[in-house]
């Protein structure tokens, strides 16, 4: 094989590989919730404080009202793992009825009586005519010693 043929093959393979890279890249738009702006915050929860006693048991939850739109719900899954969710119903703009109430592992919005699973954030009873429904807005919850740090 001549040097010219080998050179052309390498150039062709390089061009083919580059074209493959460009074509395999897709622009997926992350669908943001249009009703809830995302605030940046970091909030440590000291589990030794009495106001957070409900978080010491699996299935326990607390509402931290000074965070987010309508507060942040922190939920203890199994004693060692925590989830944090925005306490404002994600399927309409914040209003007087949009703060969700927690009962066991279900969060309910009193505006439309939407119910959300606190383990997944998913809407359990979507309306039949809805084109788009949003899950609860998730916040990070990280265990650090005797604290849980909730952040976004």
What residue spans do the PLM features occupy?
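C-terminal motif of bacterial Sec signal peptides marking the signal peptidase cleavage site
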Residues: 21-24
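Bacterial N-terminal signal peptides that target proteins for export
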Residues: 2-13
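Alpha-helical protein-protein interaction elements
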Residues: 14, 31-33, 108, 131
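N-terminal pre-ligand scaffold of iron-sulfur
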Residues: 28-104, 117-118, 122, 137-152
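Short cysteine/histidine-rich metal-coordination sites, predominantly Zn2+-binding motifs
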Residues: 103-113, 123-136
């Amino acid at each position: 094989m001549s040097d010219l043929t080998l050179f052309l093959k390498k150039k062709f393979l390089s061009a083919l590989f580059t074209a493959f890279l460009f074509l395999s890249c897709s622009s997926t738009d992350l669908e943001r919730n249009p009703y809830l702006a995302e605030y940046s915050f970091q909030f440590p929860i000291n589990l030794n404080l009495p106001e957070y006693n409900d978080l010491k048991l699996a299935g326990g939850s607390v509402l931290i009202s000074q965070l987010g739109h309508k507060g942040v719900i922190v939920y203890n899954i199994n004693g060692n793992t925590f989830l944090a969710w925005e306490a404002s119903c994600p399927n309409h703009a914040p209003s007087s009825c949009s703060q969700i109430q927690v009962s066991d592992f279900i969060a309910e919005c009193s505006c439309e009586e939407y119910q959300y699973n606190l383990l997944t954030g998913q809407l359990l009873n979507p309306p039949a005519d809805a084109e788009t429904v949003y899950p609860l807005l998730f916040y990070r919850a990280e265990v650090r010693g005797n604290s849980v740090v909730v952040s976004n």
